[in-house]
């Protein structure tokens, strides 16, 4: 997709000169102060393409940029963020641009594990390099996807949160995988996350860490997940060797997901009473039922013609 085509769709794009508007070889960081990058003039449809310039998008509430900052995010991006207007960045895979059908104000959301950024959702007040130099020998390029179907803000945010949580789980993985599942699945269940949401997250986590050399890896691990949920004696991520800040980062994302999904409620079992017990029990009359039974009968008698001699 060309820059003019993106501009035609209403996407705000600016251009800047690497090494002039950026410090040294850091071609992604615009440091120009006059004007500052938020005040750079927007590129217009009929502007000629400057081969020496970098082009960057200024996301908005309507056009949101998802930045896949880790391997797990890039591996699962088409599961959680299928389609999109365009894909761009390093190797044309680092970012995806989506239109939001119900623009909702936000600036930037960021999911981290420790000091490492794993996933970002960028809106107003941010910019991302669409095309041009990222480093001396590394370029950003655009790939047109052609999917114009918009997401709702809730759909976009829920996908972002679930993918971000999986990235945290991949980053924090330790010990035997089954033991690890006991801790993270237990943590989500303890926080009253919907069980189907937990299963979806677990399935995609297993995809992210797939071990093809282990026979039936996916099938066996999902059996473990279902067994953990069925047991209802849940473990916690506090049993892992994570720092307190990492535990807090993960719990924050879990709490946000729980806030957007219906809480899991254990199905209630039916209570059975023997027929003999019912027959031997003297139940008090219920006026509303008796009234409902008698009223039609009384109306019938009142309407019935009288028999006998006239």
Predicted features, each with a name:
Residues 57, 170-174, 291-292:
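Short boundary motifs at domain starts and secondary-structure transition points
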Residues 93, 100-103, 134, 148-265:
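Modules that initiate DNA replication and primer synthesis
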Residues 1-167:
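Conserved phosphate/metal-binding and DNA-contacting active-site motifs used
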Residues 65, 128-129, 185, 189, ...:
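Long, contiguous hydrophobic alpha-helical segments, chiefly transmembrane helices and signal peptides
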Residues 264-310:
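The Walker A/P-loop phosphate-binding site
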